[in-house]
Swiss-Prot record:
Organism from which the protein derives: Pseudomonas fluorescens (strain ATCC BAA-477 / NRRL B-23932 / Pf-5)
Primary gene name: hemE
Keywords: Cytoplasm, Decarboxylase, Lyase, Porphyrin biosynthesis
Compartment(s) of residence: Cytoplasm
Name of the protein described by the UniProt record: Uroporphyrinogen decarboxylase
Keyword flag Lyase: yes
Length: 355
């Protein structure tokens, strides 16, 4: 494979020296970009965009073509590809978000679920990874990703997104045996899926635990973190002669950073409710940190965006081990020039911390 021209993202994840703080944005290929909206219209719908490797490659590269400051590309896909490959029948309803034709509600439902083969059942994702990696031609590293077992389980049990996770939590407390079996199957599936992405060309991987923060402290340890730890222990950590860093991101996980840092990953994603300086004092000796600007700051004027970037950089302080990002995904209404101001500010203002 082509040698990397810009590896500062991978270096920062491993706390190796960098010239400036690297930056990328969760959902950087998304609806805030007019070129993305045009591609989505051409594809017909969101799933057609995900399932066609050429379209997935096109939209993955769009933010990089617009913003030369981006230090990483992230595979354009959806976290719900795994449940779909298990036969749940994923579809999207306008204004409703993701839905499943089948809902998991009993132990028998869970026992019947297959563990998808990443190459046979999710080959379109592997093809997208290899296509994107080829087209990147060493420009920046490519991030692969998956949802966490707990997060995927909530969608499968609820039948879609949820505000209170009533059905998922009822199963967790009322029928923990069933929930553990579901989470175990998902952990096996995620491990195989991420290893497939790494073999196809992903140079780092992130596990999105979007709904881990909805759990109590005890339930988080048992039903979310334990399964992410299992996945991390089964991942390929070196490929093509280079380490493959692993990032864990639990939204709402700021209370549990110490235990997340013990899970074996290289880096922790932080949402915007954490102070990054405090997080560094708590776990910075073990892991690098990724984050953590509130994405709604991007609605503000460029000077306000710049001030918030400066504040977060100062809070983290000197040295490597910080990948700048948002604390969650960029939202569709953000002006593209505001995202550009954010990315420019990170590189410009961070050089002083790496002298």
């Amino acid at each position: 494979m082509t040698a990397l021209k810009n590896d500062r993202f991978l270096r920062a994840l491993l706390k190796q020296p960098v010239d400036v703080t690297p930056v990328w944005m969760m959902r950087q290929a998304g609806r805030y970009l007019p070129e993305y909206r045009a591609s989505r219209a051409n594809a017909g719908d969101f799933m057609s965009l995900c399932m066609n490797p050429e379209f997935a490659c096109e939209v993955t590269l769009q933010p990089l073509d617009r913003y030369p400051q981006l230090d990483a590309a992230i595979l354009f896909s959806d976290i719900l590809t795994i449940p779909d490959a298990m036969g749940q029948g994923l579809y999207f309803e306008t204004g409703e978000g993701p839905r499943f034709k089948k809902v998991v509600s009993t132990l028998a439902d869970i026992e019947a679920l297959p563990i998808p083969d990443p190459h046979k059942d999710l080959g379109y994702v592997m093809d997208a990874v290899s296509t994107i990696r080829r087209e990147l031609n060493g420009r920046v590293p490519l991030i692969g990703f998956s949802g966490s077992p707990w997060t995927l389980a909530t969608y499968m049990v609820e039948g879609g997104s949820s505000k209170d996770f009533r059905k998922s939590k009822a199963m967790l407390y009322d029928n923990p045996q069933a929930m553990h079996l579901l989470l175990d199957k998902l952990a096996q599936s995620v491990t195989a899926y991420l290893n497939g992405q790494i073999r196809a060309g992903a140079q780092a991987v992130q596990i999105f635990d979007s709904w881990g923060g909805s759990l109590s402290a005890a339930a988080y340890q048992e039903f979310s973190l334990a399964y992410m730890r299992k996945i991390v222990s089964g991942l390929i950590r070196e490929h093509d002669g280079r380490k493959v860093p692993v990032i864990l991101f639990t939204k709402g996980g700021g209370l549990w950073l110490e235990s997340i840092a013990d899970a074996g990953a290289d880096s922790l994603g932080l949402d915007w409710t954490c102070d990054i300086g405090e997080a560094r004092r708590r776990v910075g000796s073990k892991v690098s940190l990724q984050g953590n600007m509130d994405p709604t700051v991007l609605y503000a004027n460029p000077q306000a965006i710049r001030s918030e970037v400066a504040r977060i950089l100062a809070s983290y302080g000197k040295g490597s081990g910080h990948v700048f990002n948002l604390g969650h995904g960029i939202t569709p209404e953000v002006k593209p020039e505001h995202a550009g101001a954010f990315l420019e500010a990170v590189h410009e203002l961070s050089a002083q911390y790496h002298e």
